[in-house]
């Protein structure tokens, strides 16, 4: 038959099985495609491995170390976000070593976080939710100062409060790899590291399009919309009267938006 008349190429069942891996995660058998990570396998099975620097569609950097898990036969913990799931692998996500590692990581991050603002009963964001989940003391030794400063002081739409930034770099990677704008970057190193907006701190000069991608991916709310967040923190933001599906007018892609309508 001519090439355009041929049907789809059928794969032998053995070829399909070779492209799959069967792993055991917390006692549950999971079949995953070759090349997928432990995190992919776990999420596909509904098993929650905590993450902070990892985010869907972003390049994996594995720098927060919150997703480390125990793998049978390995002497050290492995990052679930960056470790390929191989056939026969046995993974424990909440082993004593993994949990203690998460508590240690969260404690270190709390050293540069305003712990007195964390609610006693629940977290306001992803990071605080993990602090509660692993029952980490909400205290600071005071050895390191809080990060300070609004990186967008003249921005009428977005506030970037460094005091709650944990340097996960989600915002930097989202701006660079999803929006392909590259407005944000990490400046300096060590305890002096911070996220900056362009060379002079002016988002307009840096080419910001105010798409809101950095707001969406931030796990602590360090980057947030000005008006809604102020009301949310004050407890005065009412539930939306309705939600309207619309289309973003910025470019020709036609991304759909869900707009929350408050007070008419």
Identify the residue ranges that each predicted region occupies.
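Conserved catalytic-core segments of large NTP-driven translation/proteostasis enzymes
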Residues: 245-255
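Short strand-turn-strand beta-turns centered on an Asx-Gly dipeptide
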Residues: 25-28, 72-73, 262
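Generic start-of-chain signal for non-secretory N-termini
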Residues: 11-35, 227-230
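N-terminal cofactor/phosphate-binding cores enriched in small/glycine residues
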Residues: 30-87, 101
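Short beta-strand elements
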Residues: 69, 257-261
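Fe-S ferredoxin-like electron-transfer domains
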Residues: 65, 74-210, 215-216, 220-247, ...
